[in-house]
Amino acid sequence: MIVIGVDPHKSTHTATAVDPATNSDVGSLRIEASLAEYRRLIVWAKAWPERTWAIENADGLGHHLALWLLALGEVVLDIPTTATARVRELSRGGRRKNDRIDAAAAASVAALQGDARQVHPETTSDSLALLDERRVNLSHSRTRTVNQLHALFRELMAGGAPTSLTSTSATAALRGFRPRTGPDRVRVELAKELIADIRRFDEQLKANAAKIAVLLDEHGTRLREIDGVGPVLAARLLGRTGSPSRFVSAAAYANYTGTAPVQIASADSCQHRLSRYGDRQLNSAIYTIAMIQIRMPASAGRVYYDKKIAEGKSPRYATRALKRHLASHLWRIMIADENRAARTPSEVVADAS
């Protein structure tokens, strides 16, 4: 088995074949980032029928090449840049760095079965991740535009506009206003442009929510049955988690989301502190779910929270414990969703009968 490490860049990719038995380079090739050059790469790689590809940052600069190789039936591993840096520093020339060394380092990580993660074809979760990212960008742009509009209204009229400003209320506020100076006329024109921008953002956010709902129905997830999980949070959870089976346990997923406490132990002292690591967007989503459930008296989350309070824990500790509990619960539901989707039609019929 030969491992082909790839150091991807925007315009070029460098591939280095490594024999794991001896950890030696057996060949290297540099190509341009184009389909024609991809084909040249695969022809070069056919010299090793039993091969695995190890692409550094396959979710970033190596994304297109990784998907192209998957379409050909190749086995592709994603190698974090931090892992290649460690290998390069410890075993491949210290501070020396070039594309060939980086590619060989990626192959070495894959051969050692360290931080490598197998890349799979894209699924509905990837579509949800794209829509969620777009929604976040739209929301930020809308908030920024509303803030600009508030600034103009403060300059146009005493007291400015109400805090909860919408395109409709902003239009109504301008309707009876008569600018008296040249700068005020410009402010009114700019305000009308910003109102049009807000209206457009609202329409785009509405369309985005509709697309998310369709994809969630297609996915068949049961996350929306959990108190506090609506379409937007469900899309974020699925999109940023990807395949839940890549986490070996609920504890591993909790660590990934940053909801697992960090142990600080020395001699006879053992304490746990809040984790500042993990996927912070997933952490934020789980926090939102926890806070919603705490405010719902009949929810399972509120029962769990009250149990911790009854044990003498502080509200902050109880909230963190609920987040950790929710992370495990969410992971199990996503695992069940994945297993259900993997069943064949005959298995579904057999279970129903």
Where do the language-model regions lie?
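Gly/Thr-rich phosphate-binding beta-strand-loop-beta motif of the actin/hexokinase/Hsp70
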Residues: 1-19, 106, 138
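Short, basic/hydrophobic alpha-helical segments
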Residues: 35-52
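Short glycine-rich phosphate-binding loop at a beta-alpha junction
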Residues: 50-61, 223
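Short alpha-helix plus adjacent loop in nuclease-associated cores
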Residues: 77-118, 130, 169-173, 269-277, ...
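Glycine-rich, often acidic, oxyanion-interacting loops/wings at catalytic, nucleic-acid
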Residues: 131-222, 349
